[in-house]
Amino acid sequence: MRIDNTSVFFPAEEGGPTALLPDIEEGVTAFHFSIQLDERFPLNYDHEYQIVFIETSDGSHVFGVQLGSPFTNPPGPLPAPNAHSFKVLDHSLNVLFSAPSSPRSWHNFAVLVDWDNLTLKVYYSKDGAPLKPVTGTIPNLSVSPGGPGKGEFHFGILKLPLVDPNDSPSDQGDVVHHGIQEGSTEGLFYSGVFVEKVTKGVSTGYGKTIRP
């Protein structure tokens, strides 16, 4: 999957989108995905990249996976110290788990979401290794219970801009309409993306499961 200068957003008033969403966000579900860096089209780690997330109706994320330097206004030193690490975030943007990215390696994740008890748990492995839990069960209590706390499962490359010093102070925090975007072609590889309803165990690979 790649992003370049043709990856633009259209204002919401230009159309009224409709979509059919699967009813998967109930009970306990595990969101599985594997990601590999694209060395031909490297990311610019001065930027923040939101690469997997569940977006609720208010624009917040039940959980998210981030690469690059978190957007701040005013900006700090770039790239940030953890810019080259995958970071799994909760709804309040706390980092639950991080893993250094490495070229030519597949980074495998499963994020377990308990929709009733509002908790998260992260599983991770590299390449062909089976998934293992890398966190305990963590409260995610800032997310709204019920329907408002559910949303759309996204995987892709959402690149936030850098602050443009020529913008007005009020515009410098508007990441949708303002900021610096170089327009270079950048990419990631995705594989093994699926959602699993968890009753007795979480799939870890090779037909095996582990108790949640």
Give each language-model segment a name.
Residues 34, 87, 110-112, 121-123, ...:
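Beta-strand cores of modular interaction/reader domains in eukaryotic scaffold and signaling proteins
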Residues 60-63, 94-98, 129-136:
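Surface-exposed loop/edge segments in extracytoplasmic proteins
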Residues 102-121, 127-128:
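Localized edge beta-strand/strand-to-loop motifs within extracellular or lumenal beta-rich domains
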Residues 87-108:
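Short, aromatic/His-centered strand-loop micro-motif at the edge of beta-sheets
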Residues 1-81, 90, 139-212:
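Low-complexity, Ser/Thr/Pro/Gly-rich disordered linker/stalk regions
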